[in-house]
From Swiss-Prot:
Oligomeric form and interacting partners: Heterododecamer (2C3:3R2) of six catalytic PyrB chains organized as two trimers (C3), and six regulatory PyrI chains organized as three dimers (R2).
Gene behind the chain: pyrB
The keyword Transferase is annotated on this UniProt entry: yes
Name of this protein: Aspartate carbamoyltransferase catalytic subunit
GO terms, biological process: 'de novo' pyrimidine nucleobase biosynthetic process; 'de novo' UMP biosynthetic process; amino acid metabolic process
Organism encoding this protein: Albidiferax ferrireducens (strain ATCC BAA-621 / DSM 15236 / T118) (Rhodoferax ferrireducens)
Family: Belongs to the aspartate/ornithine carbamoyltransferase superfamily. ATCase family.
Length: 320
């Protein structure tokens, strides 16, 4: 991890910031998943609100664009009855040269209780968490290629929902692992929750061989990677983070690593297919798979709201 290993926990071992799945004990991960279970049904109610964060102010600070993640955080906060402030960072003081910490100090002076931060620089949410007041909490909504803990947790929730238990699963993470903060968050969570086999799958240029110390099996062919898998997590190619020609072409990638109905037959008959989005159809996944019976991509989005509600309610309920 970057910075202090226990920055996310107070002296009693309670979650006060959610910055990474790395370093969090199994009990905390399970607490978030169990709490999310209580929130899933709220979306089906006529009044989709609970008063847990009434009177609290949640600031969404997205220095990097993400419609899906920002929207689900906003929905989650509003369902907890929080006041939500979305900052248009592109037009804000950050463009005018104000430092990140000066921005946070000014927003804290406006009585912020919780910052949801997405930033292109790895470690930015950690820096913020080190400098906020004891009653203020930080949730990392994605920092560089480092971590995306709520996506990792919603992936764990989805897996647990469909597979009940992690102890006998084989999970394959396929695609641009090198640039994926989701892959790192998933790997740390899966190993902590007791998944016995996690595979990372893709060409050598975007699936480094030195990932084995993370407790994963590295596979450089799709056939090896998904054979007998219970769960397949597809990742998009992050061309915006690639410097140089790491891949021949999208078409070549699809030919070798794109998940098609034919290739999916190598996995277990009851395998589920996941994707953090946005999907690039015809690049990492065939439409017939994305829209097929094995796909749980849309339920992931639904569960994401409940998981983000759980994360916000837990951190806001604990003092530093």
């Amino acid at each position: 991890m970057l910075y202090k290993r226990n920055l996310q926990l107070n002296k009693n071992g309670e979650l006060i910031h959610l910055l990474s799945t790395e370093g969090l004990p199994k009990s905390i991960l399970t607490q978030v998943l169990d709490t999310a279970t209580n929130f899933v049904s709220i979306g089906d109610r006529e009044v989709k609100k609970v008063p847990l964060l009434r009177g609290k102010s949640v600031f969404n600070l997205f220095f990097e664009n993400s419609t899906r993640t920002r929207t689900t955080f906003e929905i989650a906060a509003k369902r907890l009855s929080a006041d939500v402030i979305n900052l248009d960072i592109a037009k804000s003081s950050a463009v005018k040269g104000e430092t990140l910490l000066d921005t946070i100090a000014n927003l804290s002076a406006m009585a912020a209780d919780l910052f949801v931060v997405r930033h292109s620089e790895s470690g930015a949410p950690y820096l913020i968490a080190q400098h906020v007041a004891p009653h203020v909490h930080v949730i990392n909504a994605g920092d560089g290629r480092h971590a995306h803990p709520t996506q990792g947790l919603l992936d764990m929730y989805t897996i647990r929902h469909y597979k009940k238990d992690f102890s006998n699963l084989t999970v394959a993470i396929v695609g641009d692992v090198l640039h994926s903060r989701v892959a790192r968050s998933d790997i740390h969570a899966l190993t902590t929750l007791g998944c016995p086999e996690v595979r990372v799958v893709g060409p050598k240029t975007i699936v480094p061989g030195d990932m084995a110390p993370m407790g994963v099996r590295v596979c450089h062919t799709l056939e090896e990677g998904i054979k007998g898998a219970d769960v397949i997590i597809m990742l998009r190619l992050q061309n915006e983070r690639m410097s140089g020609a790491l891949l021949p072409s999208s078409q070549e990638f699809f030919k070798s690593f794109g998940l098609t109905p034919e290739k999916l037959q190598l996995a277990r008959p009851d395998a589920i297919v996941m994707h953090p989005g946005p999907i690039n159809r015809g690049v990492e996944i065939d439409s017939a798979v994305a829209d097929g019976t094995h796909s749980v991509i849309l339920p992931q989005v639904t569960f994401g709201i409940a998981v983000r509600m759980a994360a916000m309610s837990i951190v806001a309920g604990n003092e530093a």
